[in-house]
């Protein structure tokens, strides 16, 4: 059995952690002496009344590395340090963990020092720290000063591609590589790209890039959104997701919740019962276990 991860969580982050865990589909309860206990098939996360946070389970290592540290524990340390004025390209995605709606991937190319200085003058930061109104406003600023590209994979296309790749990380690598290839200068010279490390091995993205016509070097790291160009890309990806969700809701006359929570499953069951499996498949990611749970509940 692995050793539990233990830390103390600032009270200001309690609500954020609870909301994000619900969005990710964790089942929340409140045993005695706790603020909440959250469970998934591979991770148990307990926040005690004292503020002590305990994480354990076979999936805890990935949970901490790819979610807890970059999205929760380091949220309050997102203050800018030294300005990096090296020309570079940033890429990020939105919608990966949302049952309903598309997967959106965006890239931003800041070509020179002037462009980067303009970005540093704004309130650009990781899109997870911004509300929808701030996202939409900052997206206009980013487009006015940078070269940008956005890919929106609506559920119908997303499900088709997932059927081809059979793996979310390989699909993400293909999409990231496509955006990087579209924006990278030729020759790339000293320009480089930065991407979040979404797979356990850097080779997944590198293999996808080898199939493209670019020689640009890529840095992959956890918490890549702390770089202002990646943060700008995360804002454009989130803007695309917000806009695409609105279009889906209007097209199907439905209100679609974000994330993968119990509410999402409830709405999914309602859509299946009233509109059928075909419509549900056009608005959700069918490889999510939530899809099978919804369909199984209807046939039970």
Curated annotation (Swiss-Prot):
Main localization (coarse): cytoplasm
CDD domains in UniProt: RNase_HII_bacteria_HIII_like, RNAse_HIII_N
Catalytic activity from the UniProt record: Endonucleolytic cleavage to 5'-phosphomonoester
Domain RNase H type-2: 86-300
Needed co-factor(s): Mn(2+); Mg(2+)
EC number(s) per entry: 3.1.26.4
Protein name: Ribonuclease HIII
Gene of this entry: rnhC
């Amino acid at each position: 059995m692995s050793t539990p991860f233990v830390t103390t969580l600032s009270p200001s982050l309690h609500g954020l952690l609870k909301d994000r865990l619900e969005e990710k589909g964790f089942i929340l309860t409140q045993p005695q002496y706790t603020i909440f206990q959250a469970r998934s098939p591979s991770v148990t996360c307990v926040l005690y009344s004292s503020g002590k946070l305990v994480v354990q389970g076979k999936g805890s290592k990935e949970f901490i590395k790819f979610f807890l540290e970059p999205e929760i524990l380091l949220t309050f340390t997102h203050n800018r340090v030294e300005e990096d004025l090296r020309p570079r390209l940033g890429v990020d995605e939105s919608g990966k963990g949302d049952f309903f709606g598309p997967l959106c991937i965006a890239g931003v190319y800041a070509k020179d020092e002037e462009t980067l200085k303009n970005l540093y003058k704004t309130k650009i930061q990781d899109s997870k720290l911004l509300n929808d109104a701030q996202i939409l406003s900052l997206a206009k600023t980013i487009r006015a000063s940078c070269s940008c590209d956005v890919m929106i994979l609506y559920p119908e296309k997303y499900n088709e591609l997932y059927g081809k790749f059979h793996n979310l990380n390989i699909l993400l690598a293909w999409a990231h590589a496509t955006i990087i290839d579209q924006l990278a200068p030729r020759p790339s010279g000293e320009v480089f790209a930065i991407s979040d490390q979404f797979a356990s091995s850097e080779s997944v993205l590198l293999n996808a890039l080898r199939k493209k016509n670019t020689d640009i070097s890529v840095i992959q790291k956890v918490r890549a959104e702390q770089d202002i160009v990646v943060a700008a890309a995360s804002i454009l990806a989130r803007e695309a997701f917000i806009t695409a969700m609105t279009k889906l809701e209007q097209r199907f006359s439905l209100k679609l919740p974000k994330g993968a929570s119990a509410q999402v499953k409830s709405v999914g069951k309602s859509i299946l019962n009233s509109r059928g499996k075909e419509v549900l498949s056009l608005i959700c990611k069918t490889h999510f276990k939530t899809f099978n749970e919804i369909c199984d509940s209807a046939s039970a």
